[in-house]
């Protein structure tokens, strides 16, 4: 599995050229993309500026000597490469398993070419088997949680080291065990209107390419947007 992730990450780096502003994703597959960008800077003299989607990725990039700016210091991002937890045939996806969904979506929004790197196990017919992360402000988080309980969404506060997980933006994450999301577009709209929710892990019709590594090799799927 790790080898498949590495293959996808290295393939994605082929879409990066000199002079670009590059969004560096978060997670186990995006990790290999960041490593490859670091190698190209060191060995090939690749010249880019990068923005990151989490404190973890920032630390990785700094260790590799990748020059960084904040998202507010750039107007547009040429290409962002990130992982995904599930991708359906309509190129809707669930992200946020690593807890960085808000920053990931902030960086994805001004990106010209948004690419996901996944192994073939992440391709699904319908979203929802992977728990959907919902980032909520700490104030009133129990109110949102109880609302989800009443709706039958089987919510659970994400935990880390025996305490509630806190995101880089100092929010909580509630994971929803939905099983199947029949209409991701409609469900995203519902979540967007709930006060206290900062962001959710449904990334619908945002991605331009999905790089999939499998037993047969690496393929690049083009989204029909």
From Swiss-Prot:
Q: Which Pfam families match?
A: Rib_5-P_isom_A
The enzyme's main class, written as a single word, is: isomerase
Isomerase as a keyword? yes
Residue positions annotated to bind substrate are 26-29, 82-85, 95-98, 122
Reactions this protein catalyses? aldehydo-D-ribose 5-phosphate = D-ribulose 5-phosphate
Keyword vocabulary terms for this entry: Isomerase
The residues responsible for catalysis, as annotated, are 104
Origin: domain of life: Bacteria
Could you tell me which pathway this protein works in? Carbohydrate degradation; pentose phosphate pathway; D-ribose 5-phosphate from D-ribulose 5-phosphate (non-oxidative stage): step 1/1
Q: What does this protein do?
A: Catalyzes the reversible conversion of ribose-5-phosphate to ribulose 5-phosphate.
Subunit annotation: Homodimer.
Q: Which family does it belong to?
A: Belongs to the ribose 5-phosphate isomerase family.
Supply the name of the protein. Ribose-5-phosphate isomerase A
Native source organism of the sequence: Streptococcus gordonii (strain Challis / ATCC 35105 / BCRC 15272 / CH1 / DL1 / V288)
Q: Which gene encodes it?
A: rpiA
């Amino acid at each position: 599995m790790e080898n498949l992730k590495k293959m996808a990450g290295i393939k994605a780096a082929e879409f990066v050229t000199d002079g670009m502003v590059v969004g560096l994703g978060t997670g186990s597959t995006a990790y290999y993309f960041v490593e490859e960008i670091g190698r190209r800077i060191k060995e090939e003299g690749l010249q880019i500026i990068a923005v990151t989607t989490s404190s973890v990725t920032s630390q990785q990039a700094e260790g590799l000597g990748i020059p960084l700016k904040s998202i507010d210091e750039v107007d547009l991002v040429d290409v962002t490469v990130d992982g995904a937890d599930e991708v359906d045939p309509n190129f809707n996806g669930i992200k946020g398993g690593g807890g960085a969904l808000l920053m990931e979506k902030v960086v994805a929004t001004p990106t010209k070419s948004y690419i996901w790197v996944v192994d073939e196990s992440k391709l699904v017919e319908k979203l929802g088997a992977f728990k959907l992360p919902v980032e909520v402000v700490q104030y009133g988080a129990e109110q949102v949680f109880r609302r989800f309980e009443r709706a039958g969404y089987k919510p659970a506060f994400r935990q880390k080291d025996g305490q509630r997980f806190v995101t880089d933006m100092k929010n909580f994450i509630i994971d929803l065990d939905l099983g199947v999301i029949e209409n991701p577009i409609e469900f995203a709209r519902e979540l967007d209107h709930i006060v206290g929710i900062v962001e959710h892990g449904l990334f619908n019709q945002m991605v331009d390419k999905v790089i999939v590594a499998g037993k047969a090799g690496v393929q690049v799927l083009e989204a029909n947007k």
